[in-house]
Amino acid sequence: MHIKPEEITSIIKNEIKNYEKELETVDSGTIIQIGDGVARVYGLEECMEGELLEFPNQVFGMALNLEQDNVGCVLLGSEEGIKEGDIVKRTGKIVEVPVGEDLIGRVVNSLGQPIDGKGPIKNDGYRAIEVPAPGILERSSVNEPLQTGIKAIDSMIPIGRGQRELIIGDRQTGKTAIAIDTIINQKGKDVICIYVAIGQKQSTVANIVNTLTEEGAMDYSIVVTASASESAPLQYIAPYSGCTMGEYFMNKGKHVLIIYDDLSKHAVAYRTMSLLIRRPPGREAYPGDVFYIHSRLLERAAKLSKENGGGSLTALPIIETLAGDVTAYIPTNVISITDGQIFLETELFNAGQRPAVNPGISVSRVGGNAQIKAMKQVSGTLRLELAQYRELASFAQFGSDLDKDTQARLEKGKRLIEILKQDQYKPMAVEKQIMIIYAAVNNFLLDIKVSDIKKFEKEFLEYMDTHHREIGKAILDKKVLDDELKSALESAIVEFKKIFLM
């Protein structure tokens, strides 16, 4: 085959004409210091705060400190094999997690990667873990109840959908138990639950997942975990990741319940990170913006207006106190951010009152509007009567000769406390709560021995289920106790008492 030189020339000229030079530019920097899950990188002049950075070995990091000549970042993975002098590239993105329906029923880490051994998760895309909270005009007031199934809470400290209610108490007082009971009680109520475990032992999280599975609650739940063995940055981003997963459902008009267990460990993880990247310490060695990390997280809980789909995200953050000290830095911060708190006391817990809720200093600032009217009617005087009982009980220890009125109040108080006791993983339907609290508040239990109250409650509710199911149904339908319902309920109580006292 003979090719003429001029043909070769024209082919080369053609190729040169059509050649497009593409340069891929990557903003990169050099590691000048690494250790303890923290790196300092020289360069990266265009880096954004919170930006995702790519380190060698497919490890990612997050830029936190933008200084004059270097960037302080935290690693979202192992620093093994990464050394000084290695190249770090910008990604131009901020930290994102997968969202979607397929996350339901799964256990994932802070980055949304499955850790339950059930294979990959199909997602509906990725969303940034840090987004602004809904504005005032996008919200509506809290007006729908979120039933916890716990008598002491639903009657005296009601929670509404879209509220932020803090659960606070010492270690081993039943804080997580209240949160898990609330998740179990959402069965069949079309609420998606997200449990975020921050700095917990892996064995504890495994127990919680087993409990939720046994109770059938994993069918509508997501568990996000950053265990105690994981790095501080992963513990720090866990609640934001969980919140983003929840917002996906809220924006679709669904109702979401999210539990942060617990924000004390979250603050400690943030303090660790901040001190390592040499931010100046403040009170209790926490950095100055520790209030802001919790306020921007909890402000994302909302009840959206009808125009925005009417979805809601209810947050139950948990805080662990030391020796009941609610005046410490982190507890006071979170109390001031939330719409109320459920305070659990060690003394009550050890005295056998479980859940160990102290109604004196527990409060719900917005949930009262969401409580159903029938519950308001029966529990209106409950908090006051319990407070009076506690006061009288402390005086009664000193004097033996008490007048009849005081004795009657003490006897009633004992029965009210007994009625508010409840076993773990046994949430109660709201109509049943109303019936038994009505009986206690209206003096129907004064002739029942205190030791028999639990037995009376169990048998009474079974009796109402079999003989007077229409009363419970009427309470749910009407949502108010009218005279007709009251007289039907009273006659049913009297009827059952005759059988019980035989």
Swiss-Prot record:
One of the record's GO molecular function terms: ATP binding
EC number(s) recorded for this UniProt protein: 7.1.2.2
Site (Required for activity): 362
UniProt binding sites for ATP: 169-176
Keywords: ATP synthesis, ATP-binding, Cell membrane, CF(1), Hydrogen ion transport, Ion transport, Membrane, Nucleotide-binding, Translocase, Transport
Membrane topology listed for this record: Peripheral membrane protein
Reaction catalysis annotation: ATP + H2O + 4 H(+)(in) = ADP + phosphate + 5 H(+)(out)
PROSITE patterns given in the database record: ATPASE_ALPHA_BETA (PS00152)
Subcellular location: Cell membrane
Enzyme class per UniProt: translocase
CDD domains per record: ATP-synt_F1_alpha_C, ATP-synt_F1_alpha_N, F1-ATPase_alpha_CD
Entry-linked InterPro entries: ATP_synth_asu-like_sf, ATP_synth_asu_C, ATP_synth_asu_C_sf, ATP_synth_F1_a_nt-bd_dom, ATP_synth_F1_asu, ATPase_a/bsu_AS, ATPase_F1/V1/A1_a/bsu_N, ATPase_F1/V1/A1_a/bsu_N_sf
Cellular component terms (Gene Ontology): plasma membrane; proton-transporting ATP synthase complex
Function noted in UniProt: Produces ATP from ADP in the presence of a proton gradient across the membrane. The alpha chain is a regulatory subunit.
Homology family: Belongs to the ATPase alpha/beta chains family.
Subunit note: F-type ATPases have 2 components, CF(1) - the catalytic core - and CF(0) - the membrane proton channel. CF(1) has five subunits: alpha(3), beta(3), gamma(1), delta(1), epsilon(1). CF(0) has three main subunits: a(1), b(2) and c(9-12). The alpha and beta chains form an alternating ring which encloses part of the gamma chain. CF(1) is attached to CF(0) by a central stalk formed by the gamma and epsilon chains, while a peripheral stalk is formed by the delta and b chains.
NCBIfam families for the chain: atpA, PRK13343.1
Name of the molecule in the record: ATP synthase subunit alpha
Organism annotation: Clostridium perfringens (strain SM101 / Type A)
